[in-house]
Design a protein with these regions (language model features):
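Structured, hydrophobic secondary-structure cores that serve as assembly/anchoring elements
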Residues: 1-172
């Protein structure tokens, strides 16, 4: 509020969206949506415009997360879409952040395997490093299931590669 001019100053909720990302990381996990009643708070006296259901639907279909006013809970960010056009789980902020987090954790855990002999011990070390990470994410409501496939062939060993595929099923 601008007390000198006795009027409200309206700021975009972008500042709150960024804060909600950080707060979500600090209070839960990055794969939780930084939106909704629990994690979607907008720090304001009131919204500049109170949306109606038709407004919210139109915004969400256009990949814009609406800001919704609740009588009891205040103003909240009410959506978690990103700008991906295709309709899939990948157009959700929480799923994108889940993938980024898993990728980072696995990369860090597997650094010690680089330049190791390409044998069954290294393959087992990889699985020993990756499975607990994915088990932890599953235990903390990020994924409901996963599968790790290591395609260890003679050709890949000769190229000093350990190709693998990790399949995950994000929690909806």
């Amino acid at each position: 509020e601008d007390t000198d001019n006795s009027q409200y100053i309206y700021l975009p909720p972008t500042k709150d969206a960024v804060r909600n990302f950080a707060q979500t990381d600090n209070t839960s996990y990055s794969w939780f949506a930084p939106a909704g009643i629990n994690r979607g708070g907008v720090d304001c006296v009131r919204a500049h415009y109170v949306t109606k259901l038709a407004d919210e639907d139109a915004l969400y279909e256009g990949r814009i997360n609406p800001v919704k006013t609740f009588a009891r809970d205040g103003v909240k960010i009410w959506g978690q879409k990103n700008l991906q056009i295709n309709e899939s789980q990948l157009n959700r902020i929480s799923v994108r952040r889940l993938l980024l987090r898993i990728r980072k954790l696995i990369a860090i855990a597997c650094l010690g395997l680089i330049f190791e002999p390409n044998d069954n011990t290294t393959k087992q070390s990889f699985l020993t490093a990756v499975n607990p990470i994915l088990d932890n994410v599953r235990a903390n409501r990020g994924i409901s299931d996963y599968r790790v496939e290591v395609n260890d062939t003679v050709e890949s060993r000769e190229r000093r590669e350990l190709p693998c595929k990790i399949y995950i099923k994000p929690v909806n």
